[in-house]
């Protein structure tokens, strides 16, 4: 695609200034095999005499043998002359160094000839368009009524917002067939952006071309790992002076709506503005945006939300109608759109509004994957394909919906700048509370407390050791070089990308579950990387806000993946702790990491025995209440009732987890949550009551001292252990100057603790066979046209080209998100509804059957707490034996009676048969 200015770059004296006719003109070219020390600067003399905006020579896009989509009947920048001059090009040994290809990009301009019958449109009806067939004149003329308004003229009226307006006329030429040349078998197009957008942003004038006037489309027909070898490249490497990428930001998304996507992009744009405002920085400053590339990767063309795609089109990063299904018989695996946008965004209510010229430019790459292949595959495109081309310093990972703080990305980058051995870092993930309104939902409040506790206690502890068990994929950063594999192809990325293949029939169930938390594997591999000493750090000043589930069914499904993935990944890390010794860490650091491994092992053991530990604490505390000094008989009755309620709820959890979908049994799951809350209230009452009574007993003796409390086993076991934990939480929160969650969310978290321990853990372990990410299979996307190779190495493409068509298309995209989004209505198919009904009936029958048999055994044996009602142990034992003997006699005589009844019936049958004879 040609990035040279429109028109003849050599003016009238073509032969004298052409790099082919006059080799001396090559003195300003960029390093290449022939001239490794020369710079590269395009001639800046377009047709006619026009005034130019100042543009640094380093920001001029170098010529390249790809094709501009313009309002001319033939492709621009390449023809048979290119083939004649570069016959050797396809066959020589391809260099993996992008700088080696500048010679190929330096070509003479193409002088097109009209192909009869190629374009059936009569341009005579459009004033000023007759010159479209004259390549000696610029396409955009001052007198052209269809041209974009000059934003630098006195008559220009700046419009700070893009308001969708109806198209003033029907489409004139929606799609035109154009013939273009493949470059090294790859289809790459330069597409002009809609004049409606171009009018509102600064750009090169007088027909010149820059990164603001055209969007670059590449149809990738290869696997991500082959992107570089297949000779694909990105815009940053095509400037006269290739740009260095200091910060490479990826936003991965599945089917998030426009609001969630815009929320993330608003945060990213603010961070880029912040770095551009740091004028005293040696790295950043006014042109900091040139060192930052933002990559948006959507997982599946059929999955992307249409409103989100429309927002990308509004930014200039997407155009409908140019993507291809196949190129030269090869299936397209990803559609790559590149554009430097100057359109900002703001959120008003739940709507997205675009604001042109509202901020600094942002270099965007939008990668729309053809198929839904999960998040790890998206990261393969980011690291293996784009990362290898750009060779960035720091990579930042974001999920669509996570909003980084206004300087959070800079804070993450600063951690790497300060600590050379920092291989990865993460910030604080905050729960989006909508100014506190969402705290009225106990589930959200409980998660907010959990997140805060993790950011105050867990992450700082792990950061102090140098190994954070998980850098959340929703907001984290890595040093690109720390991720790279060694010369044998082994390393962090190799282990990380194995997870893409761990969801098929050949994957081991342990490994498949482990890769549900693939970011934990990546963290472990970075710290234990052979002959390296990378560390992981937590950056408290860097924050990112995200939504959390506000419905129990959604919450259970999310935690199923988290718990299973984290558990099996922790087992992997613990059992492979010996890999620490292959790293180049100091002995002290290895010793510290070994201590952290022991700490994580203890944590894992507590998680494994969590259900049993919680029941034992409940049983012991509620049994105390039955003492004569406490509640006496009332305590015994309450203890038995609540113990039966506890066990019944626990069994229900198992039955539902083994066969019922949370979304289809929401009422049953919510009933269990309420029962666990009720049980927790009683447990808290028991703890407080037992503690208060023990203190009262000590005071009553008259010899009470403060040290006496610690000699009281009941007080010491309950208060010192639990109280010190809660007090420690409060003190740590105050020290971190973030104590408000202790006042707004503490009670909700305590009440939901049994739900975390029982419901979530039971569902997770009962569904270890489910290794999906909670997403369904592929939907069939609309089939796209193919680009088939013709004689001469050319293909036909159908593309919108006319200004009116481009504007109408752009306005149509704006209209998609101009209206308020329709209220999302979750529908359940009849098949799912019927299946949920059958499963619910099955579970109800199983529960009734189990509870009836349990009750029978408990009553007969006086077990499950019934034995507490007798104060005389010997009498209780005698009574239990008597009841057992009576039950035994009833059962045995019942069996005998039934057998006799059957025998009599059989005899009667024989008697009747004797008289009937049949």
From Swiss-Prot:
Low complexity bias locations: 22-37
Principal location listed in the UniProt entry: membrane
Keywords from the named record: Cell membrane, Cell wall biogenesis/degradation, Glycoprotein, Glycosyltransferase, Membrane, Transferase, Transmembrane, Transmembrane helix
Alphabetical list of Pfam families matching this protein: Chitin_synth_1 (PF01644), Chitin_synth_1N (PF08407)
Secretion signal, residue range per the UniProt entry: none
CDD domains: Chitin_synth_C
Family matches, as InterPro entries: Chitin_synth (IPR004835), Chitin_synth_fun (IPR004834), Chitin_synth_N (IPR013616), Nucleotide-diphossugar_trans (IPR029044)
Gene Ontology terms: biological process: cell septum assembly; chitin biosynthetic process; conidium formation; division septum site selection; fungal-type cell wall organization; hyphal growth
Top-rank taxon, per record: Eukaryota
Gene Ontology terms, MF aspect: chitin synthase activity
GO cellular component, one term: cell periphery
Residues carrying sugar: 712
Record function comment: Polymerizes chitin, a structural polymer of the cell wall and septum, by transferring the sugar moiety of UDP-GlcNAc to the non-reducing end of the growing chitin polymer. ChsC and chsA share critical functions in hyphal wall integrity and differentiation. ChsA and chsC share also overlapping roles in septum formation.
Family that this chain belongs to: Belongs to the chitin synthase family. Class I subfamily.
Protein name as it appears in the record: Chitin synthase C
Source organism (scientific name): Emericella nidulans (strain FGSC A4 / ATCC 38163 / CBS 112.46 / NRRL 194 / M139) (Aspergillus nidulans)
Primary gene name: chsC
């Amino acid at each position: 695609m040609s990035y040279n200015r429109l028109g003849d770059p050599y003016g009238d004296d073509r032969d004298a200034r052409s790099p082919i006719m006059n080799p001396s003109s090559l003195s300003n070219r960029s390093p290449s095999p022939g001239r490794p020390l020369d710079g590269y600067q395009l001639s800046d003399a377009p047709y006619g005499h026009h005034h130019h905006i100042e543009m640094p020579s380093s920001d001029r896009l170098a010529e390249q043998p790809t094709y501009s989509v313009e309002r001319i009947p033939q492709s621009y920048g390449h023809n048979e002359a290119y083939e004649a001059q570069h016959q050797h090009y396809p066959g020589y040994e391809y260099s993996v160094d992008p700088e080696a290809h500048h010679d190929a990009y330096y070509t003479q301009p193409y002088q097109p000839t009209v192909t009869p019958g190629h374009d059936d449109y009569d341009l005579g009806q459009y004033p000023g368009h007759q010159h479209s067939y004259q390549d000696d004149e610029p396409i955009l003329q001052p007198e052209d009524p269809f041209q974009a308004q000059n934003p630098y003229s006195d008559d220009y009226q700046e419009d700070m917002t893009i308001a969708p307006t109806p198209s003033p006329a029907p489409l004139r030429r929606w799609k035109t067939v154009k013939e273009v040349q493949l470059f090294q078998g790859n289809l790459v197009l330069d597409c002009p952006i809609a004049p409606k957008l171009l009018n509102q942003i600064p750009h090169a004038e007088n027909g010149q071309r820059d990164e603001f006037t055209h969007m670059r489309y590449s149809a990738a027909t290869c696997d991500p790992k082959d992107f570089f070898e297949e000779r694909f490249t990105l815009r940053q490497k095509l400037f006269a002076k290739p740009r260095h990428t200091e910060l490479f930001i990826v936003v991965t998304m599945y089917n998030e709506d426009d609001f969630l996507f815009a929320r993330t992009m608003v945060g990213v744009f603010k961070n880029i503005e912040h770095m551009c405002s740091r004028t005293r920085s040696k790295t950043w400053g006014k042109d900091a945006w040139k060192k930052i590339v933002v990559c948006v990767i959507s997982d599946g063309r059929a999955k992307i939300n249409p409103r989100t795609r429309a927002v990308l089109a509004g930014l200039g990063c997407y155009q409908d109608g140019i993507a291809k299904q196949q190129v030269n018989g090869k299936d397209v695996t990803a559609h790559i759109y590149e554009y430097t946008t100057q359109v900002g965004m703001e959120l008003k209510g739940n709507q997205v509004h675009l604001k042109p010229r509202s901020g600094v430019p942002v270099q965007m790459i939008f990668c729309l994957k053809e198929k839904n292949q999960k998040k790890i595959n998206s990261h393969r495109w980011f690291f293996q394909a784009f990362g290898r081309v750009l060779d960035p310093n720091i990579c930042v990972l974001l999920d669509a919906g996570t909003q980084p703080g206004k300087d959070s990305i800079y804070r993450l980058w600063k951690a790497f700048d300060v600590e050379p051995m920092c291989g990865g870092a993460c910030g604080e993930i905050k729960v989006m509370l909508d100014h506190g309104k969402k705290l009225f939902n106990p589930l959200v409040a409980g998660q907010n407390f959990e997140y805060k506790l993790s950011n105050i206690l867990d992450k700082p502890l792990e950061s102090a050791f140098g190994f954070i068990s998980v850098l959340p994929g929703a907001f984290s950063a890595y040093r690109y070089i720390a991720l790279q594999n060694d010369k044998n192809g082994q390393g962090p990325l190799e282990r990380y990308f194995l997870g893409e293949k761990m969801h098929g029939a050949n994957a081991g169930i342990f490994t498949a579950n482990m890769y549900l938390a693939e970011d934990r594997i990546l963290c472990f591999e970075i710290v234990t990387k052979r002959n390296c000493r990378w560390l992981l750090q937590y950056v408290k000043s860097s924050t990112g806000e995200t939504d959390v589930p506000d419905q129990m069914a959604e919450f259970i499904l999310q935690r199923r993946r988290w718990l299973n993935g984290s558990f099996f990944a922790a087992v992997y890390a613990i059992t492979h702790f010996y890999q620490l010794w292959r790293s180049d860490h100091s002995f002290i650091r290895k010793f510290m990491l070994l201590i952290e491994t022991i700490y994580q092992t203890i944590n894992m053991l507590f998680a494994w025995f969590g259900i049993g530990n919680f029941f034992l604490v409940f049983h012991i505390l509620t049994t105390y209440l039955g003492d004569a000094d406490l509640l006496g008989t009332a305590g015994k009755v309450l203890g038995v009732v609540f113990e039966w309620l506890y066990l019944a709820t626990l069994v229900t959890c198992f039955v539902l987890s083994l066969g019922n979908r949370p979304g289809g049994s929401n009422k049953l799951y919510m009933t269990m949550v309420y029962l666990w809350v009720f049980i927790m209230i009683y447990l808290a009452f028991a703890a407080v009551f037992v503690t208060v009574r023990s203190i009262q007993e000590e005071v009553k003796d008259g010899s009470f001292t403060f040290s006496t409390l610690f000699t009281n086993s009941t007080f010491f076991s309950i208060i010192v252990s639990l109280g010190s934990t809660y007090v420690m939480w409060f003190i740590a929160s105050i020290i971190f100057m973030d104590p408000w969650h202790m006042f707004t969310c503490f009670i909700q978290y305590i009440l939901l603790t049994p739900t975390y321990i029982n419901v979530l853990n039971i569902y997770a372990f009962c569904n270890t066979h489910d290794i999906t990410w909670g997403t369904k299979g592929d939907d069939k996307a609309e089939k796209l046209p193919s680009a088939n190779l013709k004689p001469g190495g050319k293909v036909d493409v159908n593309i919108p080209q006319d200004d009116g068509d481009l504007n109408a298309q752009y306005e149509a995209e704006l209209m998609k998100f101009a209206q308020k989004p329709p209220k999302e209505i979750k529908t359940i198919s009849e098949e799912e509804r019927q299946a949920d009904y059958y499963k619910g009936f099955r579970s109800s029958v199983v529960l009734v059957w189990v509870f009836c048999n349990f009750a029978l055994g408990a009553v007969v044996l006086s077990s499950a707490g019934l034995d507490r009602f007798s104060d005389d142990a010997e009498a209780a034992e005698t009574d239990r034996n008597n009841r057992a003997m009576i039950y035994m006699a009833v059962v045995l005589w019942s069996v005998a009676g039934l057998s006799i009844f059957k025998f009599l019936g059989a005899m009667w049958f024989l008697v009747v048969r004797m008289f009937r004879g049949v």
